[in-house]
């Protein structure tokens, strides 16, 4: 195992809230404010660390992983799976870590929550992430629009069951 996972802490929430991604991925940036810190500390987020205990990313699950436009599109009507979201530290993206990061995060959730079906949504332009999800057994189940900073962004719903 390359990564270890631990509950989100105040310190790590503050660090993650400062992460800034390069365009076009910068729409994944968090705002550094108390509301975001509270969100990261709501119990649905956990940190991922590398083998020398450096914070490398995070996972979230449940309502925290859902995109608002998905409700109107009906993708969250089926409750028999766990919604997940994730993020790698910006300097680690595009370096080939994604496949193992996603696999180990899902394995951790399976172990902790005894869940076997997962759902995630990803911006349709994020081909790097889509490739990683497909490599991890996710299949596309539909598309929908959701507003991000006042702009409609197309998202893809993907499911993994096993």
Cite the ranges covered by each PLM segment.
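Acetyl-CoA-dependent GNAT
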Residues: 10, 22-91, 112, 161-162
């Amino acid at each position: 195992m390359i990564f270890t996972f631990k509950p989100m802490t105040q310190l790590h929430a503050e660090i993650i809230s400062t992460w800034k991604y390069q365009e076009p991925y910068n729409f994944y940036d968090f705002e550094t404010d108390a509301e975001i810190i509270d969100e990261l500390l709501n119990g649905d987020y956990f940190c991922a660390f590398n083998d020398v205990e450096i914070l490398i990313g995070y996972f979230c699950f449940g309502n925290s992983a859902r995109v608002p436009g998905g409700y109107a599109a009906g993708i969250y009507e089926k409750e028999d799976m766990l919604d997940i979201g994730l993020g790698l530290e910006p300097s680690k993206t595009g370096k080939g870590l994604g496949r193992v990061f996603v696999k180990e995060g899902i394995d951790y959730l399976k172990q902790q929550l005894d869940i076997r079906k997962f759902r995630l949504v990803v911006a349709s332009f994020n081909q790097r992430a889509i490739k990683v999800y497909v490599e991890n057994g996710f299949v596309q189940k539909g598309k929908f629009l959701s507003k991000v900073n006042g702009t409609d962004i197309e998202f893809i719903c993907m499911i993994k069951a096993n």
